Design a protein with these regions (language model features):
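N-terminal export/assembly segments and adjacent metallocofactor-ligating motifs
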Residues: 1-218, 257-258
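Glycine-rich, charged/polar anion/phosphate-binding loops
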Residues: 11-13, 236-241, 275
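Alpha-helical structural motif
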Residues: 69, 208-212, 237, 241, ...
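Extended, charge-rich low-complexity interaction segments
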Residues: 135-159, 227-234, 239, 306-325
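Short amphipathic C-terminal alpha-helix that caps PH/PH-like domains
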Residues: 212-220, 271-272, 276
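A charged, amphipathic alpha-helical module
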Residues: 221-266
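Acidic catalytic cores of enzymes that act on phosphate-bearing nucleotides/polynucleotides
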Residues: 264-325
Length: 325
């Protein structure tokens, strides 16, 4: 539980910036300045320590009282025929307020991260998925397959907290865990085990990921693949990976939608999610979509909870009108 020491330090602080629920930070607050003392990383420190400079509302570049700024915005919304509310880098209460404002002003509401979010949302809406939680990963994973993502760049403490943790709830041998990258090569050594075991890397360009994932799924299903290579990867290497997935007791396929920045990436997400379902016919496997930085998941969940639809929804007709395209 978060608490403050006599020296003005805040202990066991949760990070709203990292996307993996780090809850062990020590921070110091001095006026408008926040400093991460312990357990920070590049993402968390940037979030907490970015200087707060502009704290006064402005209209046309001039500082004005808050009441005047609110009145100005209200008039703009009232006079607009097609207002848009965007950004949404906020918390739950901020997202609720933005949804209420969109409804009242008949605006379109969207998140700055919608392009990435829809790579997951469209799959969830179409065929569904089987996904797990960070706690389940920490306690159960024995094979982690990272698809098309350099997760240690965007989630620097993922391996420290979720994979190479000191112990698991079920007395698993942590060192026996396997990490495999498919697509992108990791930018650092976070995926290396405490005793020096390197991650296996099966590299290919993003453009080939849809084809590579399709072949991997076919191999998991026991289909015959006549090709010798796909996307520069030997099919025998993918066959070995398919067998590893089938032999694992609790594999986790992890991806970050923001990293899958190519046309129709949602079809690749769908393929890997369907592969997870295939694996569950004989063993246990789950997906893990990473995200949540800067309020993107919060905004989508609040929108779905309050309107029945995710972001990119229009209220101009007096009711929610969802159009992801």
């Amino acid at each position: 539980m978060t608490e403050m020491t006599d020296s003005g330090m805040w202990l066991e602080v949760s990070s709203p910036f990292c996307g993996i629920a780090s809850d062990d930070l020590t921070i110091k607050v001095d006026g408008n300045t926040v400093t991460v003392i312990d357990n920070g990383d590049a993402v968390t420190k940037k979030g907490f320590e970015t200087p707060i400079t502009e704290i006064s509302p402005r209209v046309n570049g001039k500082a004005v009282p808050l009441e005047q700024a609110v009145t100005h915005i209200a008039n703009l919304l009232r006079e607009s025929k097609q207002p848009a509310i965007a950004g949404m880098a906020t918390d739950l209460n901020g997202a609720r307020s933005a949804m209420a404002l969109a409804d009242k002003s008949r605006a379109t509401i969207d998140s700055m991260d919608s392009n990435a979010s829809f790579r997951n949302t469209l799959v969830l809406q179409d065929t569904g998925w089987m996904v797990t939680t960070l706690t389940e990963v920490r306690n159960r994973v024995d094979l982690l397959l990272v698809v098309g993502s350099d997760i240690e760049r965007d989630y620097p403490r993922f391996y420290e907290r979720m994979v190479w943790n000191k112990e698991s709830m079920f007395d698993q041998d942590i060192e026996s865990r396997q990490v495999v990258y498919l697509g992108k090569t990791p930018s650092g050594d976070a995926s290396t085990s405490p005793q020096g075991k390197k991650a296996q890397v099966i590299a290919c360009d993003d453009a080939y990921l849809p084809e590579v994932m399709s072949v991997l799924r076919a191999l998991v299903k026991g289909k015959t693949v006549q090709a010798k290579q796909v996307g520069g990867i030997a099919v025998t290497a993918l066959a070995t990976l398919a067998e590893q997935l089938k032999q694992a007791k609790y594999s986790v396929v992890v991806w970050a939608a923001s990293s899958l920045n190519f046309e129709h990436a949602e079809t690749t997400v769908q393929t890997l999610c369907e592969m997870v379902k295939d694996l569950n016919l004989t063993t246990r496997s789950n997906g893990l979509p990473l995200g949540g930085k800067e309020g993107s998941i919060t905004a989508n969940y609040v929108a779905a909870w309050q309107s029945g639809f995710p972001m990119r929804t229009n209220f101009n007709r007096g009711y929610p009108d969802y159009d992801p395209y």
